[in-house]
Design a protein with these regions (language model features):
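Short, low-complexity disordered leader/linker segments with a strong preference
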Residues: 1-35, 66
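Short coil-to-beta-strand
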Residues: 30-37, 126-130
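Extracytoplasmic "Venus flytrap"
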Residues: 37-56, 80-86, 108-111
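Sec/Tat-exported extracytoplasmic proteins
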Residues: 43-46, 61-68, 96-100, 105-108
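Extracytoplasmic/secreted envelope proteins and their assembly/folding machinery
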Residues: 54, 58-61, 90-93, 113-121
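Signal peptide-proximal N-terminal region
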Residues: 55-77
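Structural motif
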Residues: 74-98
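Extracytoplasmic ligand/sensor domains, especially the bilobed periplasmic-binding protein
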Residues: 101-142
Length: 142
């Protein structure tokens, strides 16, 4: 019996693939590792989505690392639980930036995504969401 990939896992993997492309273009970070932030609800009502993104990112980054990483650098995930809350998402994002992330995968729901997007612009941080789908996520008012 052939196992089908779920839409959720496909979207999680797609987000990680896109972030890896951004990292390749940016050249990564200094040192031997490139830190990638993964942000989403890991607990609470919509935790299944956040956990899927972390699982997809972990799997993909493991595969990239097994093939030598990006430009010879290994990828490291820093995942944080924003508990489905926009304020907590911004707090987690700031903590991840303090830990040296180079790019962000997530958030997974619209309200936290929009809150973090405003902050990521201030940090000039590439951000990819696999599942936030409201028009405001892709619309730039400027």
């Amino acid at each position: 019996m052939k196992k089908m990939i779920s839409r959720r896992n496909f979207l999680a993997a797609a987000g990680v693939v896109a972030a890896a492309g951004v990292l390749t273009a940016c050249g990564g970070s200094s040192g031997d590792t490139i830190k990638v932030g993964v942000l989403g609800p890991l607990t609470g009502d919509v935790s299944v989505y956040g956990q899927a993104v972390v699982n997809g990112a972990t799997l993909y980054l493991k595969q990239v690392n097994e093939k030598g990483g990006i430009n010879g650098k290994q990828l490291e995930i820093i995942a944080m639980d924003e508990q489905g809350d926009a304020t907590q998402a911004v707090t987690c994002f700031t903590k991840m930036c303090d830990q040296g992330i180079t790019a962000l995968v997530g958030d997974v729901t619209t309200t936290p995504t929009l809150a973090v997007a405003a902050e990521s612009a201030d940090y000039n941080m590439p951000m990819v969401t696999a599942s936030a789908t409201a028009e405001a996520v892709t619309y730039d008012a400027e």
